[in-house]
Amino acid sequence: QIENSLKVDPIEFQNVEKKNYLRIKTSGQIDFEKQIYLYNLNETGKPGFEVINPIKIGNEDYLINRGWISFDKKNKPEINIIDQKNIIGTLMLQSKSSSFKPKNEIDKNYWFTLDREDILKFTGRNFSKYIIYLNGNYENPRPKVITAKISNNHKKYAITWFSMAISILLIYLYFRKKNY
């Protein structure tokens, strides 16, 4: 179902039932003054920021994830070039904040999670639970490629923990035999 949603042409965003992985086209007013820099790695593992902006569409406030930039591009004017009248993106439900990540440094605009309370403090607004992920051929920021591939690392984790258990058992047997 996710794959099918991502393959269809984007639909006009006005008065549509919002759902995860819905491809949309819309226009809106992007707020560049309250731009959020969310720490993240790009697809090759290089650290940088995802650029996230408040956007007003009709009477509703959303966040739009415009993509990834390297650290040196932070606060540069060239990352704010976008056609606000022709926005194509993918609607996705905002993920829950992780308690394992550091706290956001709102005063420095250095974010690790999109904590809704922190966003309210920073912007003064409440936003939809859906985030728009920009699609298109932009270079800075470079939009995140949304795929139907859902991460499944269970096999890797099982092998890792099984290997550790075997290693500990062998170490235990070695020292036990040595003592007798």
Residue spans of the language-model regions?
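Surface-exposed, charge/polar-rich loops and edge strands
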Residues: 1-15, 19-180
